[in-house]
Amino acid sequence: MAGGSATTWGYPVALLLLVATLGLGRWLQPDPGLPGLRHSYDCGIKGMQLLVFPRPGQTLRFKVVDEFGNRFDVNNCSICYHWVTSRPQEPAVFSADYRGCHVLEKDGRFHLRVFMEAVLPNGRVDVAQDATLICPKPDPSRTLDSQLAPPAMFSVSTPQTLSFLPTSGHTSQGSGHAFPSPLDPGHSSVHPTPALPSPGPGPTLATLAQPHWGTLEHWDVNKRDYIGTHLSQEQCQVASGHLPCIVRRTSKEACQQAGCCYDNTREVPCYYGNTATVQCFRDGYFVLVVSQEMALTHRITLANIHLAYAPTSCSPTQHTEAFVVFYFPLTHCGTTMQVAGDQLIYENWLVSGIHIQKGPQGSITRDSTFQLHVRCVFNASDFLPIQASIFPPPSPAPMTQPGPLRLELRIAKDETFSSYYGEDDYPIVRLLREPVHVEVRLLQRTDPNLVLLLHQCWGAPSANPFQQPQWPILSDGCPFKGDSYRTQMVALDGATPFQSHYQRFTVATFALLDSGSQRALRGLVYLFCSTSACHTSGLETCSTACSTGTTRQRRSSGHRNDTARPQDIVSSPGPVGFEDSYGQEPTLGPTDSNGNSSLRPLLWAVLLLPAVALVLGFGVFVGLSQTWAQKLWESNRQ
């Protein structure tokens, strides 16, 4: 039976290949004297894709040809809308948008001429030829589709060809379906590609177990269900690992309609057979199932079957010893979609690579390769919108121009920041370590996208922001890490309008020390901040990230060397004075970070105590000596 089928279909296929070789396949004619490259292309909604199958050891290069015959190298270019994807042992894919460079529109069709080169490892060009991509494709009744044009290497060897028996595949209106007519490239859901020559003798045409295509039940129950071609008894003899078929109803009719096997005596009555099964679902999913039996028949490895254009994330959803299953959305995994009249056509490719075994003096393979072109066709008129999305045009870009920024630094009376000191209240007197609540704000601005940024804040002994010594309060917008009393940033409450126009922090009152004598400077401390305004747009968030690490150090006067860079500096209306806990300005001597100055009175007491004891002991000794001397003198007189 299989031999008869192969003989029956051998003559038409051979005739078709001969006609293609003689000249009808005008797009895929190789250069004289050079073997051709196997390739095919597809047309999508927004662009076209060229699929080229190199031989082992070949590297593909693409060039586009303009209307004057000039060739231009192809690289991944977002300006020209050209993209190339190439991986070892897999087809190379060249994609071009209809808006791309050198794509010409003639008579409502898009034309792109592509020059392909297969380069050997030594840099020599092994194969070179042109291909013209035309989208939408011309009428297949007048022009042979490139997917069936045979490469020149057909005449050199006897490759194993994967061919499919024709089946009746026309469904009723409104169903997702596939048309299994391999000799009609315009409607075929499977376009077999010749495999690599396999070792040993074999027939020129090897008949693949017939693939079946199923459809899901209609939404309209009054319409007649399409009854697909049933699998043969041999195809339903699955030895082990029966895989349940995806059907809505478990009836025999629904199972066979889906292209699956049915046996009510089994635990799994509806299961996939020993073939390739394609299912198209109205909820927007592809199901592709390939059996191990089919893989063995055509000398391919089941584990090497994958989606041609898919990323690595589109791996099989289920892989057993007997089957491999791909389940993915129609719009994912490299699926192309095009609109033909009132029909939506989704297409994808299943391909198989080869397993290479490397030896000490060479490499071999025992695998053939094949590709399975799957197609789902839906009637667009049957679909109703389930969601409408409105994308308003982007807001016009803000007009920017240079100008002054009005800023203000003021000191609040308490931590609530509800009232502030006026100019007549300065200088403000604070005890050492007492908190000072500081606010910097942007004035006369109502743009909510403006963000006030604090870069550096510091204290100085005069109204000159650059006078030394200085003490840093904020560094790069974050509390200065060298301060043992870390400055605290204060969040704004929700009632403050334009919160991004404000920055608040609390600093502990301090006294600047003279860098030479390390004694407290008698005077006032003025507060300064360098600021800028940032406009949030796109990826610019205008935020400052501060680390949470702490380092306790003694306050000492710092030195700023930022004066070379222009800055917007804002200062407090007046200075902050300080006094000790007794109401007097302290005159401190040198101290260390452990507060040893507070231990000095105790140290003096400890040192003076032995001296006092020594003086008292000496006095007692002198007194006793005089007493004993007088008593001795009186006793001698008597």
UniProtKB/Swiss-Prot annotation:
Residues 234-274 form the P-type domain. SMART domains: PD (SM00018), ZP (SM00241). GO terms for molecular function: acrosin binding; structural constituent of egg coat. InterPro entries: P_trefoil_CS, P_trefoil_dom, P_trefoil_dom_sf, Zona_Pellucida_Domain_gp, ZP-C, ZP-C_dom, ZP-N, ZP1/4_Ig-like. Its main location: membrane. It is a single-pass type I membrane protein. Pfam families: Zona_pellucida (PF00100), ZP-N (PF23344), ZP1_ZP4_Ig-like (PF22821). It comes from the Eukaryota. Disulfide bonds join 236-261, 245-260, 255-270, 457-478. Expressed in oocytes (at protein level). Residues 554-638 form a propeptide. One of its GO terms (cellular component) is egg coat. GO terms for biological process: binding of sperm to zona pellucida; prevention of polyspermy. Residues 165-208, 549-594 are annotated as: Disordered. The chain crosses the membrane at residues 602-622. Glycans are attached at residues 76, 379, 561, 596. Proteolytically cleaved before the transmembrane segment to yield the secreted ectodomain incorporated in the zona pellucida. PROSITE patterns: P_TREFOIL_1, P_TREFOIL_2, ZP_1, ZP_2. Residues 26-601 are extracellular. Residues 623-638 are cytoplasmic. It is linked to Oocyte/zygote/embryo maturation arrest 1: An autosomal recessive infertility disorder caused by defective oocyte maturation that results in abnormal eggs lacking a zona pellucida. Affected females have normal menstrual cycles and sex hormone levels, no obstruction in the fallopian tubes or abnormalities of the uterus or adnexa. Polymers of ZP2 and ZP3 organized into long filaments cross-linked by ZP1 homodimers. Interacts with ZP3. Belongs to the ZP domain family. ZPB subfamily. The ZP domain is involved in the polymerization of the ZP proteins to form the zona pellucida. This is Zona pellucida sperm-binding protein 1. The lineage of its organism: Eukaryota, Metazoa, Chordata, Craniata, Vertebrata.
